[in-house]
Amino acid sequence: MSGLVDAQFPDLARRTVTRYGSGWDHELFCVGGKWIFRFPRRAERVPWLAREIQITAIAAETLGTAVPVFERVGEPCEAFPYLFVGYRLVPGVGADLACARDLAGLAADIGAVLAALHRVDPSRVPPTPDGWEREPWSELRTELAAVADLVRPLLGPDLLAQAEPYLAGRAAEPPQDGPRRFIHNDICPDHLIVDAGTGRLNGLIDFTDAMVGDPALDFAGLIGLGGYRFIDRVVAGYDLPLADGFGAKLEWLSRVLTLTWLAEAAAYDPAGVGKLLSWVIRAFSH
């Protein structure tokens, strides 16, 4: 990838290029220790990335440097067939990797960031390419039931008994009522970048899945950081009203999503099973 970056961004020529990581949708490379370049893994992801260029610019108007703006946009070429982007590295580590974690301070930071994000005018948010905004939560329930056999062998007897109504698709989804806001829609420890020493929030990354939706979706992913007690601390620092029934939504989403993520790990990322299993345990510790 170094030749590709050199050709399109001459000011970065001859900088050291190292692999930074990979996800479901992108390969990431660090250039010169200061820039992260994201390359789509499949053609279907290009419209999402093009949309994310707009999304991050909108979010950065409110959150400033906490959101990495795609300052560099690479064009498709013979060396790489898709649009790609570059942004300044947000210093720090994933929120679950900090050596010293000030959980109270981090919760306050996250609450403030989510409130600011959720205040953005939702009419400014471009629609998702696949129409996710219109999907009912019943689809989450049926998707989990379809992969439940990957999860059942991973759960102890007591946890399995608690999870079975969700795995069997019998735990009905709560109403999708209340205000619809601009949400990140993929809040998790990997996307909350914190100072490695203090554990305080430095930035929020990866707006690929951002959309207009229920704010409860942005709280459910926090289960991986400290369970419901931690989420309560985040809510205390969140100064927007939450709809009646927020607690029921949070519990249902936390359980359905963590079980689904555990199934994905079992299928595609066995090394991540232990971490995701701990999230499931937290989701059912309520």
Per-segment meaning from a language model:
Residues 24-31, 37, 70, 167-219:
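Active-site acidic catalytic loop and adjacent metal/ATP-binding pocket
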Residues 9-10, 62-65, 153-158, 239-244:
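Short helix-capping segments at alpha-helix termini
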